[in-house]
From Swiss-Prot:
GO terms for molecular function: sucrose synthase activity. Fructose acts as a non-competitive inhibitor with an inhibition constant of 17.2 mM. In contrast, glucose inhibits uncompetitively with an inhibition constant of 4.3 mM. The keyword Transferase applies. This is Sucrose synthase isoform 1.
Length: 808
């Protein structure tokens, strides 16, 4: 038997050349179909439709029996048609792209570099640009010397890779340990030294003192308080911060000795996570109505507010626990910084400071938007905030200094403008920065980059995409809720991945905007507030006193601004959805699927919570969606099987509403065209309500299809309706089917989606990236200078072009 032979992997261009050489007629026929669409951009579904339209025999010839050509077509994320050329952006796997173009008339294939492909794409909008100099953004040179993984499975596990790299660097002898020694000596709180004082001068001295102190600790009972040996330890170089008892201090000393002897990734992460580093946290979320009551459902006010208000008490609990275990008597502070709205429309958004429910040392700090003419009083859309951000940041810096009487240790940004403010503050203060996007708008609005000028008057995406690029490249680490947020799936492009290479013709060209393999990316999934969201089976915790209100909401025969249409048959299960009323959330699309399915209407009632009919909306998307909802009700005569309820702001009652619907043996549907994470999906599953959710985005990872819920494709409404019909028909004949999905959802949440897991991970990340920031500060300075220039020369002018709002 012969030995196995390693063969060279042929490049994409070589494989295409081979197919062209062997099947010119079939290729010509297919490409001619593509070219016939005329000048423009073709999306994956259009390319696949053209491929499926060719005969079975031709497909077999094209694929040479190996499926090679089909694989290229399935991997193509867009085709740029500019006859006689067709250019393809081919995504070989998440984060790995190749670009080619084919001359349809001569069947010639050319490989394209990223700038060449983007230039070809720009010609759709501005014609030939050969003579013009174009600003190209390329962040790759600044990270060339940084470690980066190459395996898809490493995406989103940045801290693990970073720990392996850092521990490997520390193997190079005593000198390589010096940054760790310096890092420990830098620690202080309000001027008081922590961890090590100046009696420890070098690594040899540190090792010697650790062994000496360890010998002494071994003579003490494990629960001996640190205060009993504090003075003795201070004399040999150790300050508070190692632990509150002899046992915890011993554990830390052993870990550090192990790291100094033979560093390993796991020990390094554990050790850095236990160092006292985070006492003051600032969380930025400027847009919308940020308050704890009576705001959910207001424009720009939804999942992000819930996320932060659930995040903060859990984060504070973990900080308090760690600080105590570190042997310190320090009260942590968390400030959620948002915009102060003088016209607060019945909310607390006009109060400067508001204590966070369920937390001891956390507050909402509100700072107004202002210009030279004074303070802006009214709410404005998240798309219109850009001219106010720089002044807002200056004011925020003063306010947090006043409140904390210290610099924050960690700054967390949320959404585009919050992340830009976080970047400006972190840059100014020299503080560790964490970025949470929640949603990057570029992926939600197809072609909003190439045709940015069409969108800019309404959405000002030129400012927003520029802010996103600055923030994601400035930050120390990025948290995402899902893998898809970073790098999509086998077939779809991730939100961050879509910023790898793109162009805004006439503005600038992004040759390398972000690398999804960058070790700054970490998946840290949130949970639901377990005091509000819990299983419908936990009878002793159920809020039955709210049931009359819920029944009024769902079933009363009264139609008013709160609820429209009535439900006649109260014995049927309820199909339920709750979201903002905008295009992407697709509530009206879901209502239409239901309306067009007689079988589904026969099996279940439909209840939709979204939009606020109690007041006139100022949001243009919401206005259009409301109009469409009214039309659907009339066209399909939904009254009798359908209830449209205005947005509900009482979270506690919403939790019981999920459980009440579970009592009816109903289900929750999340029909969005794209959902970055899917907090309502987690809420519904936590309450034991079987959930059907979009496969575009985070819910595809939260739900294991058929076990803990179901994936749905919002672009194929008939199939979704059919899936729902099948589920409810099965449950009708076999109720255990409903119970199995309900239990599967609960199990999935308990294993992966809790705020305790989230908080532990976040604080550990802050420790590791704080250390990384320390050891790589010179390299980071280079990219930050580049970003300063981009901010000053490009972003500021774009922001100034956004019209200032006027108070009516």
């Amino acid at each position: 038997m012969g030995e196995p032979v390693l063969t060279r992997v042929h490049s994409l261009r070589e494989r295409m050349d081979s197919t062209l050489a062997n099947h010119r007629n079939e290729i010509l026929m297919f490409l001619s179909r593509i070219e016939s669409h005329g000048k423009g951009i073709l999306k994956p579904h259009q390319l696949l439709a053209e491929y499926e339209a060719i005969s079975k025999e031709d497909k077999l010839k094209l694929d040479d029996g190996h499926g090679a050509f089909a694989e290229v077509i399935k991997s193509t994320q867009e085709a740029i048609v500019s006859p006689p050329w067709v250019a393809l952006a081919i995504r070989l796997r998440p984060g790995v792209w190749e670009y080619v173009r084919v001359n349809v008339h001569h069947l010639v294939v050319e490989e394209l570099s990223v700038p060449q492909y983007l230039q070809f794409k720009e010609e759709l909008v501005i014609g030939s640009s050969d003579a013009n100099f174009v600003l190209e953004l390329d962040f790759a040179p600044f990270t060339a010397s940084f470690p980066r993984p190459t395996l898809t499975k490493s995406i989103g596990n940045g801290v693990e890779f970073l720990n392996r790299h850092l521990s490997a660097k520390m193997f190079h002898g005593k000198d390589s340990m010096h940054p760790l020694l310096e890092f420990l000596r830098l620690h202080n709180y309000n001027g008081k030294t922590l961890m090590l004082n100046n009696r420890v001068q070098n690594v040899n001295g540190l090792q010697s003192m650790l062994r000496k102190a360890g010998d002494y600790l071994s003579t003490l009972p494990s629960d001996t308080p640190y205060s009993e040996f504090e003075h003795k330890f201070q004399e040999i170089g150790f300050e508070r911060g190692w632990g509150d008892t002899a046992e915890r201090v011993t554990e830390m000393f052993h870990m550090l000795l192990d790291l100094l002897e033979a560093p390993d990734a796991s020990t390094l992460e554990t050790f850095l996570g236990k160092i006292p580093m985070v006492f003051n946290v600032v969380i930025l979320s400027p847009h919308g109505y940020f308050a704890q009551e009576n705001v959910l459902g207001y424009p720009d006010t939804g999942g992000q507010v819930v996320y932060i208000l659930d995040q903060v008490p859990a984060l504070e609990r973990e900080m308090i626990k760690r600080i105590k275990e570190q042997g310190l008597d320090i009260k942590p502070r968390i400030l959620i910084v948002t915009r102060l709205l003088p016209d607060a429309v019945g909310t607390t958004c006009n109060q400067r400071l508001e204590k966070v429910f369920g937390a001891e040392h956390a507050h909402i700090l509100r700072v107004p938007f202002r210009t030279e003419k004074g303070i802006l009083r009214k709410w404005i859309s998240r798309f219109e905030v850009w001219p106010y951000i720089e002044t807002f940041t200056e004011d925020v810096a003063k306010e947090i200094a006043l409140e904390l009487q210290a610099k924050p240790d960690l700054i967390i940004g949320n959404y585009s403008e919050g992340n830009l403010v976080a970047s400006l503050l972190a840059h100014k203060l020299g503080v560790t920065q964490c970025t949470i996007a929640h949603a990057l708008e570029k992926t939600k609005y197809p072609d909003s980059d190439i045709y940015w000028e069409k969108f800019d008057k309404k959405y000002h995406f030129s400012s927003q995409f520029t802010a996103d690029l600055i923030a994601m490249n400035h930050t120390d680490f990025i948290i995402t809720s899902t893998f898809q947020e970073i790098a999509g799936s086998k077939d779809t492009v991730g939100q961050y991945e879509s910023h790898t290479a793109f162009t805004m013709p006439g503005l600038y060209r992004v040759v390398h905007g972000i690398d999804v393999f960058d070790p700054k990316f970490n998946i840290v999934s949130p949970g639901a507030d377990t005091s509000v969201y819990f299983s419908y089976k936990e009878k002793e915790k159920r809020l039955t006193t709210l049931h009359p209100e819920i029944e009024e909401l769902l079933y009363s025969s009264v139609e008013n601004e709160e609820h429209l249409c009535i439900i006649k048959d109260k014995n049927k299960p309820i199909l339920f959805t709750m979201a903002r009323l905008d295009n992407v959330k697709n509530l009206t699309g879901f209502v239409e699927w239901y309306a067009k399915s007689p079988k589904l209407r026969e099996l279940v009632n439909l209840v939709v919570v979204g939009g606020d009919r109690r007041k006139e909306s100022k949001d243009l998307e919401e206005q259009a969606q409301m109009k469409k909802m009214y039309e659907l009700i009339d066209t399909y005569k939904l009254n009798g099987q359908f209830r449209w309820i205005s947005s509900q702001m009482n979270r506690v009652r919403n939790g019981e509403l999920y459980r009440y619907i579970a009592d009816t043996k109903g289900a929750f549907v999340q029909p969005a065209f794209y959902e970055a994470f899917g907090l309502t999906v987690v809420e519904a599953m936590t309450c034991g309500l079987p959930t059907f959710a979009t496969l575009h985005g985070g819910p595809a990872e939260i739900i294991v299809h058929g076990k803990s819920g179901f994936h749905i494709d919002p672009y194929h409404g008939e199939q979704v309706a059919e899936l729902l019909v099948n589920f409810f028909e099965k449950c009708k004949t076999d109720p255990s089917q409903w119970d199995a999905i309900s239990a599967g959802g609960l199990k999935r949440i308990q294993e992966k989606y809790t705020w305790q897991i989230y908080s532990e991970r976040l604080l550990t990340l802050a420790g590791v990236y704080g250390f990384w920031k320390h050891v790589s500060k010179l390299d980071r300075l280079e990219i930050r200078r580049y970003l300063e220039m981009f901010y000053a020369l490009k972003y500021r002018k774009l922001a100034e072009s956004v019209p200032l709002a006027k108070d009516e």
